[in-house]
Amino acid sequence: MPDSGLLYKEWRQNKVALVITILVFILGNPLSILNMYLIYQGCVTGKENWVGPCVFSVDYLNSSFISLFWIWGVVLAVSQLGIERSKSFFDFTLSLPYTRGQIFHAKFLTGGMVIVVPQLIGYVLSVLLIMLLKPDQAVYFHNYSLGMIIVSMLAYSLVMAGGALTGNSFAQLLVSFTVAISPFLLISLPVINLEILFGGSIDFIHGPVPKWVQYFIPIIYVDSKWAENSPYYLVIPAIMTIIFYIIGYISFVKMSNERNGYFFLWKPLNRPVQIIVIIIGIMGFGYFGFTASESFAGYLIGMGTGAVIGFLISYFAIYKKMKLL
């Protein structure tokens, strides 16, 4: 259990973000139900302006406030690591009489409690509200409400891991987003380029893929369609949350957090990542050039353009130190 002094410091330092997040998590779920109820009441009082029967349905796949809860996990992680480092508060934090492991645990516990507890409170309030309003049906309510807690923690732990590897907020967000779409970048994009080069279709990418495989792609949880499937699939983001937590913890403890402003805290990562960015730029723009011109010449021009853009982006993002706030 982290020291109470560290927990208090986290609260004081990130109080605005924490309070806003708590309020959003507590009120978001009940407000979603109230919004659906008001829409139903609007139908009842103005039937002549509506098509079809008036049905009070709590349908969480048809847009709700809680569909964006994962964003607040991102906001908390950036506030706790990226912004703190950019404002040069991190040197003070590391000078406190605590180990780096204790500091990371305090940050993660604070963020985790703010994500989990208020959402559980909002869930209980929503259950009571449903019992009071008695909707005709509640579609995916329990699966989506409880699953969003896991999804929010996944977003939080992913961005915390990104922040433990990087030296500024921009780098933290960029690395986190790249990891979120990494299966596409590492598998689908190379296969698409191989199809262009060899002029044929590769069965691996177009053949049947088990449904559970897609849930290893973090970005997939931005779309609420995951709630339609078995709740057992939520074991996958729960496991990924633990993995990202471990990566973040090890990176925070082992790397030179004092190197404020740089893209990566560990310099040996710079060159390999730059090469990967250039390769992705070549493949991405090559595919775009081929689809735009439907010719191999367009593919080559796209590859050349991607190489230049990939080099420039990687050079200025990775090797140029950002000014501190």
Swiss-Prot record:
Where in or outside the cell is it found? Cell membrane
This protein's record includes keyword Membrane:
yes
InterPro entries for this protein:
ABC-5_transporter, ABC_transptr_acetoin_YtrC/YtrD
Q: Key word Protein biosynthesis present in the record? A: no
Annotated membrane topology: Multi-pass membrane protein
Concerning what turns on (or off) its expression, the entry says: Negatively regulated by YtrA.
Signal peptide positions are none
Q: Which UniProt keywords apply?
A: Cell membrane, Membrane, Transmembrane, Transmembrane helix, Transport
**Ranges that cross the membrane:** 16-36, 63-83, 113-133, 146-166, 179-199, 233-253, 272-292, 298-318
Q: Which GO terms describe its cellular component?
A: plasma membrane
Task: Specify the domain of life of the species encoding this protein.
Answer: Bacteria
- Outline the subunit composition: The complex is composed of 2 ATP-binding proteins (YtrB and YtrE), 2 transmembrane proteins (YtrC and YtrD) and a solute-binding protein (YtrF).
Q: What does this protein do?
A: Part of the ABC transporter complex YtrBCDEF that plays a role in acetoin utilization during stationary phase and sporulation.
Give the similarity note.
Belongs to the ABC-5 integral membrane protein family.
PANTHER family recorded for this chain? ABC TRANSPORTER PERMEASE YTRC-RELATED (PTHR39177:SF1)
Protein name, please? Probable ABC transporter permease YtrD
In its UniProt entry, the species of origin is given as: Bacillus subtilis (strain 168)
Question: Its encoding gene is what?
Answer: ytrD
